[in-house]
């Protein structure tokens, strides 16, 4: 509903010529399939071969699922949006199951799910993006690893690795949880633990192997990802942060706005390490590190949402009562604002 309100507001602004960016006309017209959603929809409909090579950086799981849903009569483009929305509901449900399993109070669980669903970048969960699918898989991996159900982790890890370029990061909590019992485990369980830790890499490798066979360069998805006009090359976080701040004085205010969020997220990662099992903090830290070591910080907030333990940490920090209600209300307002800016082509989701 909030995303629909944002889209309607953006459409009104466009129709009344309050916005002069020509890109706004396209993003409003494409709606939930704007920005990267257009790539996922095009891949689902026409395949990688019909797109420029830059399309290879979008891993295949979401387009494949969208195409499968499209066979039900809605078409692959609508199928991609349906997949994202269903996955968002699955992710929220699994988060409830996971946090209850961790023994958190019911009020904290409820607060965490609301903050997760209404986080400022959470509007992308209903876009035709891979975020919702990956988050559902990542939370499922955590649930499987924390309960030592390695067969489940293997299956979900394979899919997570095929869902996005950094999907293999879900191996981090798997390794940490496996090490807790590895020495005492029987040989068969050790083999399952090793397979579970390797599964996200195998999922990614299967796609890369296909790319190598089809296009002659298995690493092409990562090579195009590091182009200067996309994520850019790897750099140290201090340099990327300094460049973002410097951009504020050259008219790139949107880039500088990532910096306050970076500070908040780092603080919440500290909370993760202090108040949650080690696997949560490690996963969040490595996910954020991969985001801030890119020369281009665009979409930082979206990548931060993938580090879902930071949302759990926020739910632990915010107290019940007026603090909780205020945090949820402010988050919902921020999400609506960011979604509006994305539809107006003023913010890169």
Model-derived features: positions:
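Transmembrane-helix motifs of polytopic, lipid-linked glycan transferases
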Residues: 68, 82-103, 267-268
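Transmembrane-helix signature of polytopic, membrane-embedded enzymes
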Residues: 95-118, 152, 278-282
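Membrane-interface alpha helices of multi-pass inner-membrane proteins
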Residues: 117, 138-143, 151-178, 199-205, ...
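Membrane-lumen/periplasm interface segments of specific transmembrane helices
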Residues: 1-18, 32, 171-180, 184, ...
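Short hydrophobic/aromatic helix or loop-helix immediately within or flanking a transmembrane segment
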Residues: 31-74, 234-239
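Short acidic/glycine- and proline-prone juxtamembrane loop motifs at membrane-interface regions
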Residues: 126-133, 300
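Signature aromatic-anchored transmembrane alpha helix within multi-pass, membrane-resident enzymes
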Residues: 198-201, 320-349
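Loop-to-helix entry region of an early transmembrane alpha helix in multi-pass inner-membrane enzymes
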Residues: 56, 60, 64, 72-93, ...
């Amino acid at each position: 509903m909030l995303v629909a309100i944002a889209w309607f507001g953006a459409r009104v602004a466009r129709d009344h010529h309050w916005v002069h960016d020509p890109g706004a006309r396209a993003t409003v017209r494409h709606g939930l399939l704007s920005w990267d959603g257009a790539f996922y929809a095009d891949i689902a409909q026409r395949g990688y071969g019909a797109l420029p090579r830059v399309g290879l950086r979008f891993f295949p799981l979401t387009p494949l699922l969208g195409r499968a849903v499209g066979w039900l009569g809605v078409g692959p483009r609508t199928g991609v949006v349906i997949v994202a929305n269903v996955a968002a509901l699955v992710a929220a449900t699994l988060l409830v199951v996971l946090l209850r399993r961790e023994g958190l109070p019911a009020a904290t669980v409820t607060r965490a799910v609301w903050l997760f669903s209404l986080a400022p970048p959470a509007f992308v969960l209903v876009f035709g993006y891979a975020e919702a699918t990956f988050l559902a898989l990542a939370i499922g991996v955590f649930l499987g690893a924390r309960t030592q159900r390695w067969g489940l982790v293997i299956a979900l890890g394979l899919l997570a690795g095929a869902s996005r370029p950094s999907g293999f990061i879900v191996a981090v909590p798997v390794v940490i949880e496996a090490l807790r019992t590895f020495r005492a485990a029987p040989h068969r369980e050790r083999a399952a633990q090793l397979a579970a830790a390797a599964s996200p890499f195998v999922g990614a490798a299967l796609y890369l192997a296909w790319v190598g066979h089809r296009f002659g360069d298995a690493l092409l998805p990562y090579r195009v990802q590091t182009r200067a006009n996309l994520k850019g090359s790897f750099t140290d976080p201090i340099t990327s942060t300094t460049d973002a701040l410097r951009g504020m004085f050259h008219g790139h205010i949107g880039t500088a706005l990532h910096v306050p969020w970076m500070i908040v997220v780092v603080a919440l990662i500290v909370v993760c390490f202090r108040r949650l099992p080690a696997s949560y903090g490690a996963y969040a830290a490595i996910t954020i590190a991969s985001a801030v070591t890119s020369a281009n910080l665009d979409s930082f907030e979206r990548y931060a949402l993938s580090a879902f333990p930071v949302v759990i940490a926020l739910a632990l920090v915010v107290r019940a009562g007026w603090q909780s209600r205020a945090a949820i209300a402010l988050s919902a307002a921020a999400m609506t604002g960011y979604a509006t800016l994305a539809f107006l082509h003023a913010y890169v989701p």
